[in-house]
Amino acid sequence: MSLEPVYKRVLLKASGEALMGGQGFGIDVTVADRIASDIAEARHMGVEVGVVVGGGNIFRGVAVASKGGDRVTGDHMGMLGTIINALALATSLRKLNIDTVVLSAISMPEICESFSQRATLYHLSMGRVVIFAGGTGNPFFTTDSAAALRAAEMGAEAIFKGTQVDGIYTADPKKYPDATRLDRLTHQEVLDRGLAVMDVAAVALARENSIPIIVFSIHEKGGFAEILTGGGLKTIVSDN
């Protein structure tokens, strides 16, 4: 395995649930610090990193709709949850002396900068980790879709989807011990087989922009950096 990174600019997508650790809600600071250390390791390798964090550990907009409430309001609440998570992860990165900026799709200048592609490219060029908050800024779109969109806007060479398991399996490995990990798939195969990697809109957007999706375990310390150099356990979704 080469010690040089295979990718120079990437988008890391982490679910809000990843920040919960063993808790049932909120943010486990120890877990946030560990994820931050993995991102810091990537930066020390010279990799430019953008991050999209979900908000499911704080709130899910679909929960409002399922109870008969307004989905738009629910999604706005979920977007605010992603901003809380982004600020927490930025704090963990800054503790490691990693220059970090939070760019929000929802304007709140007293708290963080507003998102624009120009600001994104500037901060990346200055060596900063850019955390994208607020999803796409629009209801009815998931943070997976936000990840694919921001990856395209920042010119990412790949989307790294950090999940609960180390890749895409033929079935849920937690329920079916004989399930096997798939090493490589195309975007179309993911769509045709209905595999729960990212939502359909996100996979389609990644396909249209020729962006590979690399699925790996967010819980494996050092796993992010290992995969950046070509090693580690993962599934690659790519048409090449």
UniProtKB/Swiss-Prot annotation:
Q: Which GO terms describe its biological process?
A: 'de novo' CTP biosynthetic process; UDP biosynthetic process
* Enzyme Commission numbers on file: 2.7.4.22
> Which molecular function terms from Gene Ontology are attached?
ATP binding; UMP kinase activity
Annotated UMP binding lies at G55, D75, T136, G137, N138, P139, F140, F141, T142, T143
Pathway-wise, it operates in:
Pyrimidine metabolism; CTP biosynthesis via de novo pathway; UDP from UMP (UMPK route): step 1/1
Catalytic activity of the protein: UMP + ATP = UDP + ADP
Sorted alphabetically, the keyword list is: Allosteric enzyme, ATP-binding, Cytoplasm, Kinase, Nucleotide-binding, Pyrimidine biosynthesis, Transferase
Q: What is the uppermost EC class here?
A: transferase
Kindly list the positions annotated as binding ATP.
K13, A14, S15, G16, G56, R60, T163, Q164, Y169, D172
Report the domain of life of the source organism. Answer: Bacteria
Compartment(s) where it occurs, according to its Swiss-Prot or TrEMBL record = Cytoplasm
Q: How does it assemble?
A: Homohexamer.
Describe the function of this protein: Catalyzes the reversible phosphorylation of UMP to UDP.
Q: Which family does it belong to?
A: Belongs to the UMP kinase family.
**Protein name per Swiss-Prot or TrEMBL:** Uridylate kinase
Q: Which organism is it from?
A: Rhizobium johnstonii (strain DSM 114642 / LMG 32736 / 3841)
* Gene that this sequence comes from: pyrH
